[in-house]
A protein has these predicted regions:
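Class I SAM-dependent methyltransferase SAM/SAH-binding core
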Residues: 41-44, 48-107
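A short glycine-rich, Lys/Arg-flanked "PGG" loop and its adjoining helix->strand segment in the class I
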Residues: 129-144
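Core SAM-dependent methyltransferase catalytic element
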Residues: 181-184, 191-208
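Short alpha-helix
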Residues: 41, 165-188
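Conserved class I S-adenosyl-L-methionine
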Residues: 144-175
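A short SAM/SAH-binding and catalytic strip from SAM-dependent methyltransferases
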Residues: 114-129
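Class I SAM-dependent methyltransferase Rossmann-like catalytic core
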Residues: 2-51
């Protein structure tokens, strides 16, 4: 399934729920998937990494983008699987619907965005290197890609390798995706360590 990752077993990107992803996401979910402390940490990460006045791509997004409210961007492009959720996001200047597991090609021009994000959704990608390679294509040289994740997911839709790896190993997996997609200066971070009352949060950052 993933020729770019031959060291992983062939079943690494299978899912328990094999139904089409658009069916699973057909009903809008106006909820957040991490607690307020983790959301604040994501926002602070974006505040530091994403340039004001730039163009931001929020991949696998929903009705909230966790971008710093005081920062103005030239454009925030949303992507997701449920139009009601995307339409409700006040930060999106435009959005597109796309099942990345069926088609990883982004409908965006080469070198057209300054920053990209995936927040608590990377575990659902069945062709992560192909998607990350597309992100690198649309990023301007030196553009930043921030992937954040916690210990929560829809388990029937997460890929097998994500469910089987210990929490601390997910950063290595995402770093591998970035490396195979051609990103440079890959930096894993423990943003909120596990064992605290708050939701844990990890980030992996790559530069195009």
């Amino acid at each position: 399934m993933n020729e770019e990752l031959p060291e992983l077993p062939p079943e690494a990107f299978l899912k328990e729920d094999t139904s089409a992803d658009p069916l699973f996401y057909a009903q809008p979910r106006f909820v957040t998937h991490i607690d307020e402390s983790a959301i604040a940490a994501v926002t602070e990460l974006y505040r530091v990494l994403f340039p004001a006045g730039g163009t931001v791509l929020d991949l696998m997004g929903s009705w909230v983008a966790h971008l710093p409210p005081e920062v103005d961007y030239a454009e925030v492009i949303g992507h997701g699987m449920n139009e009601e959720e995307l339409k409700a996001n006040p930060r999106y200047t435009r959005y597109f619907l796309l099942d990345l597991n069926a088609n990883p090609v982004l409908p965006l021009a080469d070198a057209s965005i300054d920053a990209a994000a995936i927040c608590v959704s990377v575990q659902y990608l069945q062709h992560p290197v192909a998607v990350f390679r597309e992100v690198r294509r649309v990023l301007k040289p030196g553009g930043v890609f921030a992937i954040t994740f916690s210990n929560r997911c829809f388990p029937t839709k997460a890929v097998a390798i994500w469910l089987h790896l210990p929490m601390g190993q997910h950063s290595r997996l995402v770093s591998l995706y970035l490396d195979r997609a051609g990103f440079a200066l890959i930096e894993p971070r423990v943003v909120i360590p596990p064992g605290l009352p708050e939701d844990p949060l990890w980030a992996v950052i790559g530069r195009a």
